Amino acid sequence: SAASDVYKRQVVDPMGGAAQGYLADLLRELGVEVHEIHAGQASDQEDICPDPVEPWVDTCERAVIEDGACAGLVTDGDADRIGAVDERGRYIHPHQIMALVLGDLVQFRNLEGRVVVNLSCSTLVRRIAEALGCRVTVKPVGFKYIAAEMKKGGVLIGGEEAGGIGIAAHMPERDGILACLILCELMAKTDAPLGVLVDQLEDSFGKTSYGRRDLRLEAEDAETLRTLLPGVNPKSICGKVPQNVSHMDGLRLAFEDDTWLLVRPSGTEPVVRVYAEGFSVEERDELLDAGCALARGTYPL
């Protein structure tokens, strides 16, 4: 029952990491035709960063199109994070994956519980969680905060922007292979390739444009920003008035229309991560530009 005839072709990309042979073999046992890339001895010779995001998933995107596969399933080096590619070779973001997995757990498996996300997560996950009757808990960036919440009980699923998705009934930790298997089963149950599932999701819950920029600063500038940020309360950004200002982890501004901006200095290096979500690429980029200016101290507050 795990795969209908139409969706028996998948590209699996373990990125030369721990999922080599595992995910591909599990799917083959279920009758899926699998093309595994970045695996076996050849993978040692390839220059790849085992991070399931663009540009590192480009090879997988090409393989999906060449094979006429219904999806590409990507796991990072230690197989706890997931990325995906749809049948059109389009990169599917972890938020979209988490939203699909959540929908599957509630609608097909009749499970319930809280949904735990980092504050850098897309509002898409919150919108679908609320529509499905799940309460949402927001934590700082880092899966350890989500895992701690899972251990308290009552949690269905937890996920982070970087692609870590954990299902509490399985274990309070991320599992990229499990997330891939659930995606596969969902394609079989709905008889739809991945891109169609994502389009349906966005038709129902709204389409947004999400982005992140990593800004490298001088060490002392990063330290200054870390010190000053808790006191920053902008009255408006890009002509929008923040409805909610959070200093839980960096500075997060949420606007009335569900768009938002997060400026978050790294705890380990002189890098500031700027995240934003808008209803168009232009709006998202305008917010990202403002966030970068804010981090550099050049935004007029």
What are these regions, as identified by a protein language model?
Residues S1-S4, K8-T190, D203:
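Phosphate-binding chemistry for phosphorylated carbohydrates and sugar-nucleotides
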Residues A71, L111-L301:
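Phosphate-binding and adjacent anionic-ligand microenvironments
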